[in-house]
């Protein structure tokens, strides 16, 4: 994200995940699983397990059912399911931000095109941010952000491999 070296990109789609950028570089962790916020636990249950209780996940609870979680924002943005979903998501993002202290939280995924979702998620997230100046914004890349990031990573990996061979 232009203007920031430290930020958290949160994707909400069929899954919920995040990319942590620190010092201008994506931090993947030792095992490549940094940012898997769907698996954050509270009271012994992961975020996905708690969302399963709201009836917005697929049958096995491994992914979100897009039709089920989009409809509350389009039809009844104040419904208990929408409010609970946003509170759980805001809490998980806030906990991740507490650990990483980003200058910005960037929202991406299919729902960022829904202003009601973005506004309500921002309102649910802000009380969970320890630093009130943390910017909460929407990705300029919209739903294409993860694809652009994966493409860039593939390119960087290929170039790195070429240079490693060249240096031998």
Segments predicted by a language model, with ranges:
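ATP-binding/phosphotransfer module of carbohydrate and carboxylate kinases, centering on a glycine-rich
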Residues: 1-3, 42-168
């Amino acid at each position: 994200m232009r203007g920031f070296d430290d930020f958290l990109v949160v994707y909400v789609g069929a899954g919920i995940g995040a990319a942590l950028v620190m010092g201008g570089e994506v931090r993947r962790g030792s095992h490549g699983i940094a940012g898997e916020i769907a698996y954050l636990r509270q009271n012994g249950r992961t975020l996905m397990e708690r969302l399963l209780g709201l009836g917005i996940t697929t049958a096995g609870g491994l992914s979100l059912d897009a039709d089920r979680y989009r409809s509350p924002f389009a039809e009844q943005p104040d419904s208990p399911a929408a409010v609970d979903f946003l509170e759980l998501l805001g809490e998980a993002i806030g906990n991740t931000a507490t650990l990483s202290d980003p200058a910005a939280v960037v929202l991406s995924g299919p729902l960022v095109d829904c202003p009601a979702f973005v506004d309500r998620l921002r309102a649910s997230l802000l009380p969970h941010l320890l630093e009130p100046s943390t910017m909460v914004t929407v990705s300029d890349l919209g739903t294409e952000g993860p694809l652009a990031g994966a493409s860039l990573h593939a390119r960087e990996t290929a170039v790195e491999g070429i240079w490693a061979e060249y240096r031998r």
